[in-house]
Each structure stands twice: as structure tokens, then as C-alpha cells.
């Protein structure tokens, strides 16, 4: 139920700031890897390879601060937030909750998809660490 409310709230949140064009929505669902546990400081390693420098430039400003992507919106279930949901324009910090801003696949996925479609996109992300695919992600039709 919480996921459904999150999705509806996200769509309402974004719909007021968009034109009448259809919105590209991507669902990101998974376990701990989808949560995203990478520290922001790991992004500097992208500068070590000429092939990944363009990606780093899409993620960070020239001064090393995180870019905020105006055409990429995200709504993410976040237990560290009082409301249980963190939403806004995509930037560093939508990874797993904790003391420091973290990143997950939402960052590069969102940047790549927005660049590919050339339109505003919405990411709806939900992930839980420590879950079993065998039990926690089984559809009700799979039986006991």
C-alpha cells in the first residue's frame, strides 16, 4: 500500500510542473544493490578513464559539487526520512539512507535515460536490503 501511495504522490508531485506531453516513468525495484551504497567520493575515479570522463561531467559541476538535473525527477522510499519518501530533482543522495550522501544505480540510469529520450523523466525507486528473492519477492500466485 505504501508503494502505491508513493507512486501516486510522485505522479502528482511531478504533474504540476510538466507540460501535457506523456511522462516517461521508470520503476527501479530491487534489493540492497538497488538501494545504492556507494559513497559520493567514489565518483572521482571516473576521471581516471577517458571513456568515463563524460559521465563524470554529467554528474558533477566543474567545482566537484553534484549537479541537480532539472529534467529528471525521482521519488524514492527512504526509511531515514520522517515521511518515508524522498523526492525531488535527481542528484547525489538518493542512495541508501545513512550519514553521508550515497549513490545507487538511479543516478547514472536517470541521466542516461533522460539523454536517450530527450524529455523529462520520472524515476520511482524502491529497494530493501536483506531480503530474499525466494520469499520476499514472490508473487502471491506462486503459492507458499
Model segments located where?
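Positively charged n-region of N-terminal signal peptides that target proteins for export
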Residues: 1-5
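Cell-envelope and extracellular/periplasmic
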Residues: 19-144
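Bacterial N-terminal signal peptides
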Residues: 6-15
